[in-house]
Amino acid sequence: MSVEVMRSVIDAAEGRVPVDTLFTNAQIVDVYGQRVAPGSVAVKDGVIVGVLYDGRDDAAGTYEAAEVIDCQGRYIAPGFIDGHLHIESSNIRPAEYARMAATRGTTTAIADSHEIANVAGLDGLRFMIEDGRRAPISIKYMMPSCVPALPDEQAGAVITAADMQAFFAEYPGDVFGLGEMMNLPGVFMADPETCARIDAANQTPSKQVDGHAPLVAGKDLNAYAAAGIIADHESTIPEEALDKLSRGMYAVSYTHLTLPTTASQCRSRWSPYH
């Protein structure tokens, strides 16, 4: 945000200048306070500059606005961020996925397209990125870390650490970091190419390296975290997630932890009756 824009939004927040749009009579979803409360939301130059809750902020008055929208009790919530997904698993293009996701409140998605990369290599990633630029939401990508997933696999492409460095430079605003590191033996054995791929991500502004470490514990988990892998979405029990959190990692997904009843009633995905 430039100084000029900052001064403009501050003036609007203080009520010294009119806001562009004022949403009134809304139910505001406060995700930090974990509550829903009635109030209004003011927007200036595409920035939310003011939230006024009914009752608590009555003394502050309201905002003068070029446009007032009566929400009639509808909800206003922050845009949802899907922090990890594989769009190509759905067999639809990024723009089409985004069209449907937007109707459910998702405004940002972080995609790891290692499936198409294992088939079509960097050209597959370019297709996903270029198509995603037409989307009504923001789609960012993680560089697939394991193409192929393991050294002995016969994938449709090979993406080396040098390839990754060049691709990060080619798409600096689209590729955030390194996608889930599935080559666990490569990390545990300090394989030079595996370490070089992690280091390539460390040269990006975000330095984001995602993990994929089901049931990894003890010294192996220490090595995984020491390599700079900061997040994992494969914990299946609370103790496993806590084990990773205690080593400074982020537990990205709690789906397995919050749906135990549903999961216990489902047949195994490997069941012959599935």
Segments predicted by a language model, with ranges:
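Active-site neighborhood of phospho(di)ester-bond hydrolases with catalytic His/Asp-centered motifs
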Residues: 81-83, 112, 142, 179, ...
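Conserved small/polar residues in nucleotide/adenosyl-binding loops
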Residues: 255-261, 274
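Divalent-metal coordination cores built from histidine and acidic residues
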Residues: 2-13, 95-206, 249
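Short loop/turn motifs at secondary-structure junctions and domain boundaries
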Residues: 30-34, 90, 156
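Active-site core of metal-dependent hydrolases
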Residues: 177-257
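Hydrophobic alpha-helical segments, chiefly the membrane-spanning helices
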Residues: 266-274
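N-terminal metal-binding scaffold of metallo-dependent hydrolase/deaminase domains
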Residues: 1-63
